Swiss-Prot record:
Bias (Low complexity): 650-669
Protein name: ATP-dependent zinc metalloprotease FtsH
Active site per UniProt: E426
Function: Acts as a processive, ATP-dependent zinc metallopeptidase for both cytoplasmic and membrane proteins. Plays a role in the quality control of integral membrane proteins.
Group of enzyme by EC: hydrolase
Annotated gene: ftsH
Family per similarity comment: In the central section; belongs to the AAA ATPase family. In the C-terminal section; belongs to the peptidase M41 family.
Residues annotated for ATP binding in this entry: G203, P204, P205, G206, T207, G208, K209, T210
Pfam families on file: AAA, AAA_lid_3, FtsH_ext, Peptidase_M41
Higher taxonomy: Bacteria, Bacillati, Actinomycetota, Actinomycetes, Mycobacteriales
Key word Protein transport present: no
Organism of origin: Mycobacterium tuberculosis (strain CDC 1551 / Oshkosh)
The EC number(s) this enzyme carries: 3.4.24.-
HAMAP family referenced in this protein's UniProt entry, alphabetically: FtsH
């Protein structure tokens, strides 16, 4: 509700109130009479001070016009009072005895007045209903709750293209095909292919699902409607289904077009999830959505794109082919994707020579595009805070720590004893991890308080991993228990600083036993299954499906794993106690140590052998024959380059060609001056179209076309300065920044899975 409508509503209410007050004020004929007690009126009658009187029989009130005012009437010559029921005759006789002029009025009541008593409150309620409905976004008449709230993007909005997306090439390729189908349908129709009716983007928060939808909107060249899943359900019954019908009706009138529903899980949750009666309104909305997506009605030319963080709770009928033909996972970027994202966000920012983006990409395993964008932005803010002019490597390092652990607590006062305990604790983590053979090397260790932690040691993997062996998970347990072992070894008692380490170790050990089947005693069995009751989103949580004896054995195996890791960490620290003291001293002096400094301190530390106490295969004896070598390993042995160069996908080449053409057109247009509307004179901006009459372009690139649009009657003149129909976008050349990004908007959730510090 804008300011103009608010002013108009307030003015209307004020006018109604003023008219009502004026009506009651001017219709009151008792104005000018002073109210007095009945005894005062009787005194005036008995004192023969009454000139005339009027008895209002219906209201049981007496009006007197006195001959002269006095103190009892405060000098007023007109008084009015009430009299008891049945005393009208006595008053008439008393006034007649004093020779006063007496008149009697019997008010029969006005039909209009009686109607106002009942109608006016009703009108007031209707007015309030209309006002609140407008404030909630209803139609102008106040009864448009069933109208769709979808927004249609216009050409004036900022355009996002596939060139602005990096790190999620698979998702871009899938969506690019839809855009290409809309612009070049003949190539697909010749093969009998049909365009997908629906596309579901799913993945963790911050991976770029909404950004991909914005890129489709900027490149599709057809009308694009966007709406949130929560906009369908309202306080009134039937509103959600009505809005779904209205949305698809608008889409059919503008077909071919695209509808984007963000957070579709708000309306697409599995049916039957109403505990104690259910949420029939949401289910009714979902049923209408299912019918509109694939029912008896015609839905030609309408493509539905939806995004969600929780595809597991969506209704199966919503996910079937014919509704969502294509389901695209949008996951966290890999190493190459993180490099591309960092190049995108660092483009246009002054970066110092020591700002190693490749190294930063290696140290940010598990971060999403939104996290990486936040890292670059935090580094820029930190540089501005220090009045710097270029973003340095230390600023990027501090930005990563801020994103992972929170801001540094500079004002915290720590005693020398607590600082010493923290140094030995973090040193125990670092030394235990350094001596283990199957764990990522420690990149940095610090005792600076940050967020809720007193310090942390960061282990950075050399490459992205999708699998972990049992030895690697045991090494993680040793890493986690290193801090607790150092406290017990040096100070002879533990502290509360290891609470997060114990929690992490317990989680790893229990998952090894109950999920991954890494216990020889319990076997390769998954203990605890998720039941499919849909009352809380499809699952009521994990429930034990094993006996109490098995639960006791699980606890024993978990305890056995943690105790073995604790003992291994203790032995490492005992063997290299002098190295631990040296490391703690360096931490107390410098507070933060990086890989080169750690390598010099741990020069004499040797890798420990793997723990074999859990390598029990029963009667199954592993083979001594080594596994075969991969083509990459064989190529490296032969001295051949690996990995072999992979040809660039066709869609990337098309994106590069279109972007280069668009940039060339803009550079040519910049040399010819500018018109009154801000576009170059004699040329047209990429994405603008002109016909005999004005036609919207919906954020399309120059030269776009789609089936059925523009209308055949439209004539489009050709312009010499306009590029040929191409596909926008541009992959980054070697050594240059890629203009893409895979981060999503800031309203997306930032709770992601990433490498966590071992000590909290």
């Amino acid at each position: 509700m804008n300011r103009k409508n608010v002013t108009r509503t307030i003015t209307a209410i004020a006018v109604v109130v003023l008219l009502g007050w004026s009506f009651f004020y001017f219709s009151d004929d008792t104005r000018g009479y002073k109210p007095v007690d009945t005894s005062v009126a009787i005194t005036q009658i008995n004192g023969d001070n009454v000139k005339s009187a009027q008895i209002d029989d219906r209201e049981q009130q007496l009006r007197l016009i006195l001959k002269k005012g006095n103190n009892e009437t405060d000098g007023s010559e007109k008084v009015i009072t009430k009299y008891p029921t049945g005393y009208a005759v006595d008053l008439f006789n008393a006034l007649s005895a004093k020779n006063a002029k007496v008149s009697t009025v019997v008010n029969q009541g006005s039909i209009l007045g009686e109607l106002l008593v009942y109608v006016l409150p009703l009108l007031l309620l209707v007015g309030l209903f209309v006002m609140f409905s407008r404030m909630q976004g209803g139609a102008r008449m106040g009864f448009g709750f069933g109208k769709s709230r979808a927004k249609q993007l216009s050409k004036d909005m900022p355009k996002t293209t596939f060139a602005d997306v990096a790190g999620v090439d698979e998702a871009v390729e899938e969506l690019y095909e839809i855009k290409d189908f809309l612009q070049n349908p003949s190539r697909y129709q010749a093969l009998g292919a049909k365009i997908p009716k629906g596309v579901l983007l799913y993945g963790p928060p911050g991976t770029g699902k909404t950004l991909l939808a914005r890129a489709v909107a900027g490149e599709a060249g057809v009308p694009f409607f966007t709406i949130s899943g929560s906009d369908f359900v309202e306080m009134f019954v039937g509103v959600g289904a009505s809005r779904v019908r209205d949305l698809f009706e608008q889409a059919k009138q503008n077909s071919p077009c695209i509808i984007f529903v963000d957070e579709i899980d708000a309306v697409g949750r599995q049916r039957g999830a109403g505990l104690g009666g259910g949420h029939d309104e949401r289910e009714q909305t979902l049923n209408q959505l299912l019918v509109e997506m694939d029912g008896f009605g015609d839905r030609a030319g309408v493509i539905l794109i939806a995004a969600t963080n929780r595809p597991d709770i969506l209704d199966p009928a919503l996910l079937r082919p014919g509704r969502f033909d294509r389901q695209i996972p949008v996951s966290n970027p890999d190493l190459a994707g993180r490099r591309a994202v960092l190049r995108v966000h660092s483009k246009g920012k002054p970066m110092a020579a020591d700002a190693d983006l490749d190294g930063l990409a290696k140290r940010t395993v598990g971060m999403t595009g939104a996290d990486l964008a936040n890292v670059i932005n935090e580094a820029a803010l930190l540089t501005a805070r220090e009045n710097g002019t270029i973003i340095t490597g230390p600023a990027l390092e501090e930005a990563v720590d801020r994103v992972i652990g929170g801001p540094r607590r500079k004002g915290r006062i720590i005693s020398e004893q607590e600082k010493k305990i923290t140094a030995y604790h973090e040193g125990g983590h670092t030394l235990a991890a350094w001596a283990m053979p199957d764990i990522e090397p420690i990149y940095k260790v610090t005792i600076l308080a940050r967020g809720r932690t007193g310090g942390h040691a960061v282990a950075v993997p050399e490459e992205d991993k999708g699998l972990r062996t049992r030895s690697e998970m045991i090494a993680q347990l040793v890493f986690a228990m290193g801090g607790r072992a150092a406290e017990e070894l040096v100070f002879r008692e533990p502290t509360t600083g290891a609470v997060s380490d114990i929690e992490q170790a317990t989680k790893i050990a229990r998952s090894m036993v109950t999920e991954f089947g890494m216990s020889s005693k319990l076997g390769a069995v998954k203990y605890g299954s998720e039941h499919g009751d849909p009352f809380l989103g499809r699952t009521m949580g994990t429930q034990p499906d094993y006996s109490h004896e098995v639960a006791r054995e699980i606890d024993e195996e978990v305890r056995k794993l943690i105790e073995a890791a604790h003992t291994e960490a203790w032995e490492i620290l005992t063997e290299y106690r002098d190295v631990l003291d040296t490391l703690a001293g360096e931490l107390l002096e410098k507070e933060t140590l990086h890989r080169p400094e750690l390598e010099s301190i741990f020069a004499d530390v040797e890798k420990r052998p793997r723990l074999t106490m859990f390598d029990d295969f029963g009667g199954r004896i592993p083979s001594d024959k080594p596994p075969i070598k991969t083509p990459g390993e064989l190529a490296i042995e032969r001295g051949e380059p690996w990995p072999q160069p992979v040809p660039e996908p066709a869609f990337k080449a098309a994106i590069a060609q279109a972007t280069q053409a668009a940039e060339a057109a803009r550079s040519d247009a910049g040399q010819t001056g500018h018109g009154a509307n801000g576009s170059p004179a004699g040329t047209h901006r990429s994405g603008d179209r002109q016909y005999g009459s004005t036609q919207p372009d919906y954020g399309a690139p120059a030269g776009w076309h789609a089936p059925g649009w523009p209308p055949r009657s439209s004539h489009r003149p050709s312009y010499s300065g306009e590029p040929a129909p191409t596909y926008p976008g541009q992959p980054y050349p070697t050594g240059q920044a890629d203009p893409g990004s895979d981060e999503s908007s800031a309203e997306q959730d930032d709770e992601v899975s990433r490498t966590k510090p071992a000590h909290g």
